[in-house]
Amino acid sequence: VEAGTNDVDYYVLEFDTTTEERAFWVAQMPDNYDGGTITARFIWTNAAGASTETVTWGIKARGYADSDAIDQAYGTEVTVADTWLAQGDIHISAATSAITIGGSPAGGRPVIFNVGRKTASDNMAGDARLIAVQIEYGISTYSD
């Protein structure tokens, strides 16, 4: 996406208003991650919307140890709703409630994150454009 006057370019994942779409990525958790619950904030913008409308984001995750089978269930999905503020502005959601990562989460291990727009739970008329997801986690030590 290009933001007009100042030629600010940025990548987004567009989630439409009628179909629940999902995105996935793998992150190697830092060595000092304590293996406990995490929270997430969604950084997003929009293609269209109005001041009374909201977007609801969902996130779930699965952690893996060496030799774990890949095809296993995620932890329970957690959602957070955020209100439309202004066309083309950065929107930062509140933090989700605690997310329990399914499987074997631990420091230094991979986690597959799965996010989506929960279209049945929101009412924003335009596409929601996901820019980033901030993950907060507990630590077991102060250094890696």
Put a short name on every predicted segment.
Residues D68-S104:
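Extracellular carbohydrate recognition and processing domains
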Residues G116-D144:
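Proprotein-processing/basic-patch segments
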Residues G103-T119:
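Noncatalytic modules at the cell exterior or secretory-pathway interfaces
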Residues T37, A50-G58, D127-L130:
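Short coil-to-beta strand junction motifs in C2/discoidin
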Residues G36-A47:
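A short beta-strand element within beta-rich, extracytoplasmic domains
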Residues E53-D68, V133-I135:
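Extended low-complexity, serine/threonine- and proline-enriched intrinsically disordered segments
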Residues V1-T18:
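N-terminal leader/pro-regions and domain N-caps
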Residues D16-N32:
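Short beta-strands within extracellular/lumenal beta-sheet-rich domains
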